[in-house]
Amino acid sequence: MNKIVFISGATSGIGKACAEKFASFNYNIIITGRREERLSVIKTELENKYNINVLTLCFDVQDRKLVFEAIQNMPEEWKAIDVLINNAGLSLGRDSFDDSNLDDWDTMMHTNVDGLLYVSKALLPNLITHKSHIINMGSIAGKEIYENGNIYCASKFAVDAISRSMRVDLLKYGIKVTAIHPGAVDTEFSLVRYKGDKTKADSVYKGFTPLSAEDIADTIYYTASLPKHVCINELTITPTRQASTYYFHKDL
């Protein structure tokens, strides 16, 4: 019987790369996202390429009602979840605290923090029953702040704290909890942050080789593939040319 992985925010970037990676190891995949057409395309691609089954759930993780309805209405055969990857997240803007946009703050906190909590809480009865593995997508920005990172950093510090709390509170159920903290990864992240400004987005990765979504997916799969008695609590992963949130060695 195939194992099942649930991946939030799976229509692009790290989430999509995780779906591909786990599918290649014969997992059946539950993918969620806001773009229904993208979910359908990915479902078809993965099922045809790997001969596995894919369930798509279209919702915005900010919407608690939709999250709980979608998860509670999943077919029974999809509820035996082995791995949950809380990947949905984003950054909007890179402005000083005094110049930041309140709507951007709300979207980041509701997506990065509330969304993770809603998905985890909705799935928790199933996760407890199956002694599942929860993998939360943090960030190096959740370990160390940087200039004009303010609320994005705050949201990822919260993910780190939530992961630590989960690890303690859910230990009695045999649930593993892992937090993954990437540095610079070349995905849609910067394009979203800079609201479609490709010049600004591309400049983030100039002068060095950033991580790829596949690098992170490989790492996540490794943590999920370890024996039941082994839990990697957290991993911080950066490009070789990145030493911290703000220090890079770039060829300019």
Regions found by a protein language model. Give the residues of each.
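C-terminal helical subdomain
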Residues: 179-180, 199-245
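The beta1-alpha1 cofactor-binding region of Rossmann-like NAD(H)/NADP(H)-dependent oxidoreductases
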Residues: 37, 58-69, 102
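Active-site helix of classical SDR
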Residues: 120, 155
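Residue(s) in the substrate-gating loop at a strand-loop-helix junction
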Residues: 139
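Substrate-binding pocket helix/loop in short-chain dehydrogenase/reductase
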Residues: 95-97, 101-107
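Conserved glycine-rich Rossmann-like NAD(P)H-binding loop of the short-chain dehydrogenase/reductase
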Residues: 27-41
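Conserved glycine-rich cofactor-binding loop
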Residues: 11-12
